[in-house]
From Swiss-Prot:
The lineage of its organism: Bacteria, Pseudomonadati, Pseudomonadota, Gammaproteobacteria, Enterobacterales. This is Acetyl-coenzyme A synthetase. CoA binds at R191, A192, G193, R194, T311, N335, S523, R584. ATP binds at G387, E388, P389, D411, T412, W413, W414, Q415, T416, D500, R515, R526. Its EC number is 6.2.1.1.
Amino acid sequence: MSQPHRYPIPASLAERTLVSAEQYRKLYEQSINDPDSFWREYAQIVEWITPFQTVKNTTFDPGHVNIRWFEDGTLNVAANCLDRHLQERGDQTAIIWEGDDASQSKTLTYRQLHQAVCRFANVLKAQGIGKGDVVALYMPMVPEAAVAMLACARIGAVHSVIFAGFSPEAIAGRIIDSSAKLVVTADEGLRAGRKIPLKKNIDDALNHPEVKSVNRVIVFRRTGNAIDWQPERDVWWHDAIDGADDTCPPEAMGAEDPLFILYTSGSTGTPKGVLHTTGGYLVYAATTFKYVFDYHPGDVYWCTADVGWVTGHSYLLYGPLACCAITLMFEGVPNWPAASRMAQVVDKHQVNILYTAPTAIRALMAEGDKAITGTHRSSLRIMGSVGEPINPEAWEWYYHKIGNGRCPIVDTWWQTETGGFMITPLPGAMALKPGSAALPFFGVQPALVDNVGTPVDGAGEGNLVITDSWPGQARTLYGDHDRFKQTYFYTFKGMYFSGDGARRDEDGYYWITGRVDDVLNVSGHRLGTSEIESALVAHPKIAEAAVVGMPHNIKGQAIYAYITLNAGETPTPELYNEVRAWMRKEIGAIATPDVLHWTDSLPKTRSGKIMRRILRKIAAGDTGNLGDTSTLADPGVVEKLLEEKHTLTLPS
């Protein structure tokens, strides 16, 4: 495959960076060789009510997995995100809110956000919510979502944010599993001009016969449209906060007290309630935010993620606010009502740091220069990518078009379970290789092992594991510690197994190759789907590609590629041959797709991730049970793909 360019550290950035290349090497060595002294110092990024004495008490031994950090210290997350900033920077902007409708935007200062959080914290207390109680949040991307999360943290309640695109069935499952006592929602949400019936979805979820724990629903008025109302259960947000006291002392929380539960998909189809605790999580979210984004006071930072995902928790809310950052919250989507919306928002709010997902980048890339028409984006200094490996072609487009060829890209690898960045460039400390997540963050010890757990030394490829704990690590799966141990620590004894594969090059840089179950075995050759997809989308006419394996009588697996073309391109027999020839040139004959399935839509979750499980089943003809499709943004895509497949000639 053609080698990507290598981009050196820009001199302008090196002059004022928080961490230089030499400092990174020294600090990383200290963080690995003496984690106690390193994290004792760096944990001071937050304020402690009771200072901790013990830094690290962890073991990955399969018999008794135990993860505890700063365990004898106490603190409060909301106080760290708000109260401690008030004296010197209370009138600084905390949140810039940009509505789905570009004419709607507003700002909240740290003082205003603090008052709103205290009021809502008192509302929760008046409803009987206290330390350890679970509150489910099903909210649109409005500042009140952040207020509700911080209010829970202030009084010691555990929030469980449910992404505002999930179905009633998915909501019910999460409420049942967490035994949430109260739900916070809105009448409706807005996204790309469409109304999302949030309150109706909650009503339907609460009608589930096994949902018995919820006795109150607080409803924020977003659109003002008519909704069903149950007077004995439902309360308007504005009525509840009317007259509520705007002072609420923060609860002193143990470092290992739960902060939030966030549900993520499990391989069995049953969602996993990932549990993060207070001290280690906040230390890690704040530290990674500060150094990976090279954040300087006054920078305007925009993470495009929804609060319903871990990226929204760690890098829209908690990490930035703990560092007294200016964080932009966006209700809309990057390419509506025009392809240039994301670039317009950057210019409108003079965004300095932009953090978005490859799926958004590829969608804009397919629009060509329409994505930047009429904008200059000169305020940008650093950009980031999150959610999945970014293919070099999309990286280059993002770098040259959105970033004007001068903004380092931090391609971050991490997971819901890790709490924060694990492998990522530091923009002032590392040269960049498009498509590579670069090197581990402080305290993170990655390794590659083969399928029996034997270490792969030097340059090579294998299963990506982490050999020791880090502060942001999830502590358990809510109510199911056995599943936690089995999922992450039993495959390779004494190591955390990420479920991802990776390649390490001769410089020690890591290249994430995708989920291990996304590795194809074609005639005995192991091929990562990520590598094949990257080569496909490097073709000038291809916007997006998803590659899966399908059974083959001779090869074992054949390569089945779902391909979306750029706007204005149409599939032809000539293009079919052209793409296959391109793949032979880029990777080799072994990586030539056996099937090219042209389609204008792929099955994606509402967070933009491609649901490969469904693509695998369609390719294999195993469509009798596609499993849970409730998280799909457009369930109709599945039927369309099945119809398209009937027109294809398939290999035997």
